[in-house]
A protein has these predicted regions:
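Conserved AAA+ ATPase core "coupling" helix
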Residues: 1-12
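The feature marks long, low-complexity, polar/acidic/proline-rich intrinsically disordered regions embedded
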Residues: 13-185
Length: 185
């Protein structure tokens, strides 16, 4: 069953004409973060207001890679519902516990198989968000990469097989290019 804020978000997205590439990232994001964080109808309004103020061509151009859009959505939403984490996302100074808490990314939700059995609690979006931010914080390095997570997550941020050149700069670039409303020329 959907919670009230997700239903409200979906209605407002439709009413406001939020572009699909933004809406399709915002809906699952709010769904997972509302499991473990307090999100009000007013918060949804603040988030959607921020969406309408995005700069650059992010609203018109749906060809950006999913990882970049997910970083944008995390920065937008965390600034409203978890301002204590927003700066840590931006500077990549969060802990794994912060990620688990914000995304409700329990081991069960981010692990496809447990003891060689399919895990019914696995949630692909939760796993993707958790490991994307871990990838950025670790500069694209996963020491124990038995599941090929580095290649999967790197593909969310770069069309090239090696991943992005400087993963740790991505949150700052997203802020600079899409979130900063007023830039000195």
């Amino acid at each position: 069953m959907k919670n009230t804020v997700v239903v409200y978000l979906e209605h407002q997205i439709e009413e406001m004409g939020v572009p699909d590439h933004i809406a399709n990232a915002l809906k699952p994001h709010l769904k997972i973060v509302s499991r473990n964080n307090s999100v009000s109808i007013r918060d949804v309004g603040k988030i959607l207001s921020a969406v309408t103020l995005l700069s650059g061509d992010i609203l018109q151009n749906g060809s950006y890679l999913q990882g970049w859009i997910d970083v944008l959505i995390t920065l937008l939403v965390s600034k409203v519902i978890r301002p204590d984490l927003h700066d840590r996302f931006l500077s990549l100074s969060f802990t794994e516990d912060d990620l688990e808490d914000y995304f409700d990314a329990t081991v069960q939700r981010r692990t496809y198989r447990i003891d060689d059995e399919y895990n019914a609690e696995f949630d692909h979006y939760t796993m993707s968000q958790f490991y994307s931010w871990l990838y950025l914080a670790k500069g694209g390095n996963f020491p124990d990469d038995e599941d090929g997570m580095k290649k999967f997550v790197g593909g969310l941020f770069s069309r090239w097989s090696g991943g992005p050149d400087d993963p740790q700069s991505i949150p700052r670039k997203v802020k600079r290019d899409w979130l900063e409303l007023f830039k000195a020329q």
